[in-house]
Amino acid sequence: LNPFEHPRAWRQKIVDNVKLTPKIRFDGKGFICALITSRCPVGCEHCMFFSNMSEGKNSVNTMTESRVTSLMRLVHDSNTGYLLVSGGGEGFLEPDLMYQIVEKTSADVTWLVTAAHWARDKKRAREVIRKMYDAFLRGEHKDHGRKICLRVSLDSQHVQRIALPNKNQLQYIVDLIRIFETEYPNEHSFVLMVHSLEGEEALVNDLCKAVSGEKLARHDPLHDNIKFTESAFTIKLESGYEFEVTFAKLLLSDLAADLRDKETLKKRVELFDKDAFRNARGNPAVNYNVDGTIGTDMLVIYNGRVAGGWQSEMPDVPINLDFDDFQSIMQKTLSDPGVLGTIENGLAYRFNIIQEVCPKAVLRSKAVNVRDYSSPVLLEEDKIKLYYSIRVLQDFIAQSRIKKNELEGWPKEIQLLTGMTRLELQSLYLSARYDIVQQFIESSHRFDGFFQCVKKYARERKPDAIIEFFESNPNISRRTVDEWRLLLKRIVNGWYDLCTLNEQEIKSVEEIEAILDERVLAGKRIFEGLSFQ
């Protein structure tokens, strides 16, 4: 049997039977980016997480109190110095969870990212900040030299959607600044930051004028030596109160980026490569500290999923706050050849191996243009997971990282695969009659029935068959339908090498995607691509 026609089972053999010993040692402060919810009431068109309110609150799209408790334990046990509570969605949709984080965090610096839609009402803004401050005091952070930073996103789209009519469009931001200026002027551990985008300098200048501020070079940069920002400065008010303004690049994010649009694709790849290989030193799973030590760099998602190595995870290994602590997270992360190979050798190593059999996978992982999606997109196909794992094992064997008795203890099938030449593996991979569609048929409930509707539509061009299928299967969630819609969109945009669809069927996919979008989902976007476990 060709293992690449049953890649999930063969990859599982590796996960179950091969346990590696890492060389890398994390001896310094770590970094965690935590997404509290996928939901956001603002709905900016440029949102790199495509956040909206199409789905009601549930345990898949929003953290629970117990998950936040587990997150705080992870922050402590992983020696995390820097905690970024980010989008995803708008964390302050769940203010009690944010106050819980403020009180319980043990990180040296904790940023709370917000669009600040809640600041349109100044009374409400004052109440939210006061509750944050009370939580800050309960946490005794001043006694430990820790900082809490409210980081407000400021750009034209946020302002357009949040500003109240008949008011200065920046009034809600001005109100926040005045609250910090008048009520917390001497709190150097409880601070405000404004975060904007390159190209929005005029808007930030307008804000500076609105608060009668003066722009200064940064002299107490909160981000320096932690995470790279494109540029920054400080605004000083007449009262002497100061806050930092940082800028980042606008990403060309798209969950179904069109690989056929070569001009835009080139820009997207350049943006990704700059961030990955200059800003993150080619290894985003490692947090490099100024004292020369290294720490872990993790991503934690609202449904509890944890990437123990940021942009380096293998999507088929479940790691979750609901059942994993720091020790088990790192054990699962560093014993998996697919993850350890990336963490120890960097992103370029992984890209080069996958390029041997599927250049499209490399392109699409960069073209999505959101770093949190790079591993799930790159390694979406089970065939690629298996190929990469085998090639990493071959390199570990060549480097004498695996003892003879360990190798002999592996299943014979794995020994056979790792003993093949690269050309033999490539030949097996490319000859396998298995693609992303077959993968969905095997792994997604009722997709096989939907796939038959796709084939029927390609022959008859009658939308009713699609509609009737979903009417007769009401238990298929809208989240699942949206995931299938996204798959079709990606097929249209040239993401995959396909063997289960003929040319006529591929041509009909765009029409079927439109039917799902307009007639089944009514334009709602629910599946966000990160909560896949």
Task: Please identify what each model-predicted range represents.
Residues 165-169, 195, 205-208, 236, ...:
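Class I S-adenosyl-L-methionine
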Residues 1-33, 478, 506:
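N-terminal [4Fe-4S]-dependent radical SAM core
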Residues 31-37, 48-203:
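Conserved glycine-rich "GG(E/T)P / GGGxP" loop and the immediately following alpha-helix
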Residues 353-531:
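Extended non-globular C-terminal regions
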Residues 46, 50-53, 318, 325:
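Secreted/processed peptides and extracellular or luminal domains of membrane proteins
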Residues 227-381, 388-389:
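Accessory C-terminal segments flanking Radical SAM cores
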